[in-house]
C-alpha cells in the first residue's frame, strides 16, 4: 500500500523533523501528495504548517527526514534549485513589488523563470514577448484588465491574485500556497476559490489555509497538523467526521454543517 502511495505521489515527505530550541515545529511528519488536484494542510496556529511549507520550498533546512519531489530527493537542493525543478511558493505575507505595475511584476516573474536576472534598470515593459506571456498568466487570475495599475493602488486580494500569477509564471509542476486567503474579504475569497479551482485542474497544489469554507470547497485531500504532527490525512468528508480531528481542531459542530 505504501509503495503504491509513493508511486502515485509527486511529493513524498518522510519523517521530517525541525526544532527551534526545545520546540518541535515539525515532529516526524510524513505525507504523500498525489499528482493533480489540491491537498490542503490545516491546523491551529503554531501547529507547524508554515514551517512545513518553508522546509519544502528550501527556505528552512530540516533537522532530519527526507523530501522527494517528482521521484528525486531535493533535501540538499536550495530554493532556486527547487524552483527550477518545478516547486513554486507563495508566501503568507504578500511578496510583490508594490511600486511597480501588475504587468511589470508578472514580467519579472516570467524573466526569472527563463533564467535571466531581474533587469531592474532595463525597460522591461518594452519586451513584447515577456509581456505576452505575463498577460496570459494575469488572464488566468483575472488581472489582465488591471495590468497597468501600480500594485500599491490595488486591493490586498488582487495582490494575492498577482502572487498566484507570478508563481504560475515559473511554469511549476506544483504550487506551495501559504494562506492564499489571508487578509482578504469575502468577495475576494470567492474569487480566489474560483481561481485556485481552475489552477488545481491543471497543477498540483499543496495549500496551508485557515479559512475552512475555502478548504472544504477546494481540497481533494486534507491533512491535519497539531503540535507539529500530522494526526490525520483523508478526504474532506472523512476528516470532517474524524473524532480525533474534531476534538483537536475542528470542533463538534463541523460534522453537523
Language model regions located:
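Glycine-rich phosphate-binding loops of nucleotide-dependent enzymes
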Residues: 2-257
